[in-house]
Amino acid sequence: MEIKDAKVFHDYLNGVIEGEDVKKSTKLYSNAKTFYKSVDPSVSDDQIMYEVYSYEHDGLCYGLTVMQPVCVNGDCNVTRGHFHENLDCDEIYCGMGGEGLLLLMDEDYHCHAEKVKCGSVHYIDGHLAHRLVNTGNTEFKVQCMWPSHAGHDYKRVEDHPFTVRVFKENGELKVEEE
């Protein structure tokens, strides 16, 4: 019997997902300005806001989002956020490091959030839009698993943005509902 090494490796404590079939996407501030309430000229266009590492095999996706501890005029760093194109596809998020929120929005555009920290596990119903918010002072890492046929519907969130923003003022979090 032949014993093979894994094709993909995830250093849970200090690293990212690595392997020949792993894709990496980097979101810079220049491409994320519309995610925030206002543009912050003090944030460089080249500032890395977050990186997503993903691996897909036989209909299942495995990913890691690494978010930087950046605020935009006090607005905590967020991911783009999306609904799934196939609303019957659910997703799992697991906190791997740092701290933040999983912001969820239903189809009537009402929001609620769950605290995410190392070790927390979050089930996301396919009918909920979801985005991550880094509320801490360190990198925020979240592992995710979803079916590859889920798709990402970013336009729906662009047309009907999340109705909640999380700000940091003097180290304290402030939630603003729009």
PLM regions: where:
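N-terminal leader/propeptide segments of preproteins
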Residues: D5-V8
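Conserved SET/PR-domain catalytic core that frames the SAM/AdoMet-binding pocket
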Residues: K117-A129
